[in-house]
């Protein structure tokens, strides 16, 4: 039966050393001393207490055994276990399971290889303890007992044993501790169990390097491995005062920092917003600087991860924003893949226990090299995150696209890849819009905006607009406008024209960007492939829309009808209409009835070439009475109207029709002046022969003829200017533009330019208000002349009628054989004639006043024309005063026209 001494931990430890090395007790004294120091030291547990690290080891082991299903099941079970708070020491349970799963048949091969490793390595690492031989029964191994005696001896194991290797790296021999001298065993009860636990854990750590015996460690390799493990022992060892941290400890901390997790010695400083090595750590400056440089990856990782975490749950961020976050997550996954490789490398070194040399270990300098490219990628991503703050939709895509304009091909390829992911939703919106006319933009990311409150009649003008801030920078404004027009044309056809033709018949639909890779391929050829798709859809859709408007809704026919009726282009119709309306329009405006005027309009249509127009056009032609003011006649309130609805109302909007109404009133008034002067000339021709027997009246008639001739010249020049220089020239430009128009917007724009030109040159704009007032004053003087001439002719004809009656009465009496006149009758007749002759100077005076006012107004009108910014109006002044009649009367005209003439001669 074995004695108690033979069962003591000391004896068992010595037997273990002899068994491993295969030598006698005297030959293993040196190794036994090292084993005693290891067991008696304050090393921390050799296995990292990391639950997830152990879980990863278990999964890797299952995968290595080709048990992928079990690995997936284990991952799910571990997730459920982690979410429950029933178990406190989950790491211990997982580590136990991992230990139990090890194959016991592999142990003999380990021991055979450990023997060589143990025999070669320990003599070099035990030089801090003197060689001596003591009975193993006398060696106390309890750390508590040793610590109690450390106060009595300055050479205790705690200060001179293996625990000091981490600080001084086995700096030299030390005196033998008194506690290890023979005969001083003072073990406490239960020390055997404690020793077994310490022995198992220490040797499990020391003897884990599964290396072939033929590969002997070098003198440089072992201290490196021991130094790595010494640092691990400090984590639960010395915690007071400054600590010396080795590079291996920094490497492990850095790998955690790379993931945004604080290490034991490197932590995030929230005040300075950076990672810092703790101040109490005793670390060389080079290692500290290198650690700080490497920690920048953790800061960059945190910045990117914080952005994605905040935005991933924000639904209002939109599809483009979510794509950006997905692109960032994809890059982070690649980054995590690198970290997993580094962790595997570090874990492999930990699993081997003792390193073979520095050339295969993970160092800070190697990390600097391996993380150079990832750092550039993270810096680029962090810069993108900063630049994209507060942006969404197309604006976000523009921000990403701005970073593709760099000379660094590595950075450009990265950003282009992200851009292909970010722009994929934008291109999906775009193709859905240009091929289907559908706009599903819940978060307002697309550059085409829709206003659901707009009614159908304003669909083309107001319903769809461009969000300029959302236009991606890789698209031009012309491309954006075409994209807007394509979808707008499709919706206009469906909703306004009620044309349900499928878009596949209008457009040759090409393959759209169905994936980010398709989008990336498209971006490589923006000027050809992308532009070609947009141009094809634009031309085909616009052409189809214009064909529908022209063939089905007769857009061009309605435009020509506007020219003929509202702009007085149908001359025979307008003249006949004036003749028919004259009896009605001379009456007060309050006595007019619209149905009477409508009947006259229909009569004029049937009596002229207007009857050959399309019934659809004639149906829209109508009479409109303007608002009546006191004293207005029918001429002042009468107007023609043209009803528009449906698709053509998109071109002829209410604003356009109001412009047509203003122009019609102006042209109608000018045409009326021409009509009045024509009547005046007729009166001259008809009454000239009748009043030939009244020589005293010739002066009045002469003044009337002169003033009427001036007015006729003025009106003829104005009519020529309005008809040819304004209407015909503008209409010719409009018609050419309409024939060449590629889309409906071109027609609308050309039509608006046409109306604006007419409004401006017909003196109806705000800048020509003074000219228009003078022109209206001229028109008023023409009406005054008509009234004055009518009164003069009326008085003259009445006088002529009386004289003829007197002569007829005289002849009748002579035939009857009576005296022709009596003295009293002759005297009365002479008196009446004398009174009439006395009224002639008043008539002449009235005509002179009228002439003076008229000429003054014309002179002021000419002065305003010469100072106009419109060159055509300045040229009009030359035609109105072609013989310089007004120039001789107005000094301002002499200066203005003379200066203008000299300028013209110089040019």
UniProtKB/Swiss-Prot annotation:
Any one GO molecular-function label of the UniProt entry: structural constituent of cytoskeleton
Disordered: annotated segments: 210-241
Keywords: Acetylation, Cytoplasm, Cytoskeleton, Microtubule, Phosphoprotein
Modified residues (Phosphoserine): 113
Key word Phosphoprotein present: yes
Residues annotated with N-acetylalanine modification: 2
Name of the protein this chain belongs to: Gamma-tubulin complex component 3
UniProt organism field: Homo sapiens
Gene from which the chain derives: TUBGCP3
